[in-house]
Amino acid sequence: MIWHVQNENFILDSTRIFMKAFHLLLFDGSLIVPECILIFGLILLLMIDSTSDQKDIPWLYFISSTSLVMSITALLFRWREEPVISFSGNFQTNNFNEIFQFLILLCSTLCIPLSVEYIECTEMAITEFLLFVLTATLGGMFLCGANDLITIFVAPECFSLCSYLLSGYTKKDVRSNEATMKYLLMGGASSSILVHGFSWLYGSSGGEIELQEIVNGLINTQMYNSPGISIALIFITVGIGFKLSPAPSHQWTPDVYEGSPTPVVAFLSVTSKVAASASATRIFDIPFYFSSNEWHLLLETLAILSMILGNLIAITQTSMKRMLAYSSIGQIGYVIIGIIVGDSNDGYASMITYMLFYISMNLGTFACIVLFGLRTGTDNIRDYAGLYTKDPFLALSLALCLLSLGGLPPLAGFFGKLYLFWCGWQAGLYFLVLIGLLTSVVSIYYYLKIIKLLMTGRTQEITPHVRNYRRSPFRSNNSIELSMIVCVIASTIPGISMNPIIAIAQDTLF
């Protein structure tokens, strides 16, 4: 009799849970249409892979790219709608979140054509690669819209697990295995630190998990200036720091960049920073509203360390990918300036604008590295000497992207840094802006050093890799070159469209 009653209660509870889930999906499902499109694309990929042969490989690329483009389209149709909190407070839909989701989708859309020839040449498993990329993109999108502590923890784990698998995709490469192990161990440690910080925030607010409710809970419990909040702030900053990879949380970055397949590095170098920046902005600005002085000081320290260490250590590197790893550490220091400035002086708008330009500059550089690596089999900076004499198109493209990363006018990087530093100066961050300007000059030095190698014509400096380099026509149907051309154009002629870009970014307010 007791068993019968318990069984009936279990059935009733299961029915209630199912009906609640169905109700949420029915009424709130329209708010996650872009994410649902990606999920549908993932299901299609699995179905085609399990029911077809190798001749249908082009369909896999087509479905992946189409699902990303359709997701971008759905996101744009939803633009400028009123902010909505859905799924019982798990997600928030607003312009700020959506523009970061757009940037993540843009990164993935550009990374897939960048990877096609590399995957074919290295004979990597195609379906799994595309599945991991789309799933990581999905995790990044959910992270941008996350509105409670549980979702903010689960969404980056979805992204991180796919990142670990992608970084170790070349299983026979010892460097890749070593990089993956470091990435996995440090990722697990950072996740533990992050969730420990969340537990302090949860307890101090009286058991609240939604970001805005945490603020209300801290006011009700009078704990907004307590030591527990300071402890939570430190742990959460360390946990998020792993995703952003500023100094001193950057130890995994150079090894993962050097050991992972180059298209994977290109994907991780932009998507992880975009998603983590969106999450960090919301976490610091909402739950830690009353501790703004403390987290400003923490982020200022991270920004200074990142800009100085990243750019100084990059000078000494001999590997192109390792140099870009340290360069990215310096770049995230510039982005942190926008987070610190906040909404009051267009800080978020400047951060978003710079992120958009950084995506094009960084992916353009990695597209050039992928092409050079496939044609020569080397990643050493010294082996780029004299590339202009063999492939002027590739050499000029790489030079333009590097100069844009350095911030030379009239390229995209210059306008992005100018807007970012100007907002920082208006907010009174004079020391940070001066450090940013000085380290930008340092970055220009090591970028120009590479460009000098590219343009050299002296025979004694040209290595056998370039001497035996296969010439490439100016016009090509190569998907990597097409992706590279798009990124190079976006990195070189932004001045014409700066005003509308800034205007759109300024609309992305809370």
Curated annotation (Swiss-Prot):
Pfam families: Ndh2_N, Proton_antipo_M. Its main location: plastid. It catalyses: a plastoquinone + NADH + (n+1) H(+)(in) = a plastoquinol + NAD(+) + n H(+)(out); a plastoquinone + NADPH + (n+1) H(+)(in) = a plastoquinol + NADP(+) + n H(+)(out). GO terms for biological process: ATP synthesis coupled electron transport; photosynthesis, light reaction. One of its GO terms (molecular function) is quinone binding. It is found in: Plastid, Chloroplast thylakoid membrane. The keyword Cytoplasm does not apply. The chain crosses the membrane at residues 24-44, 57-77, 99-119, 124-144, 149-169, 183-203, 227-247, 295-315, 323-343, 354-374, 395-415, 418-438, 484-504. It is an enzyme of class 7 (translocase). Keywords: Chloroplast, Membrane, NAD, NADP, Plastid, Plastoquinone, Quinone, Thylakoid, Translocase, Transmembrane, Transmembrane helix, Transport. It is a multi-pass membrane protein. Its EC number is 7.1.1.-. It comes from the Eukaryota. One of its GO terms (cellular component) is chloroplast thylakoid membrane. NDH is composed of at least 16 different subunits, 5 of which are encoded in the nucleus. NCBIfam families: NDH_I_N, PRK02504.1. HAMAP family: NDH1_NuoN_1. NDH shuttles electrons from NAD(P)H:plastoquinone, via FMN and iron-sulfur (Fe-S) centers, to quinones in the photosynthetic chain and possibly in a chloroplast respiratory chain. The immediate electron acceptor for the enzyme in this species is believed to be plastoquinone. Couples the redox reaction to proton translocation, and thus conserves the redox energy in a proton gradient. Belongs to the complex I subunit 2 family. This is NAD(P)H-quinone oxidoreductase subunit 2 A, chloroplastic. It comes from Daucus carota.
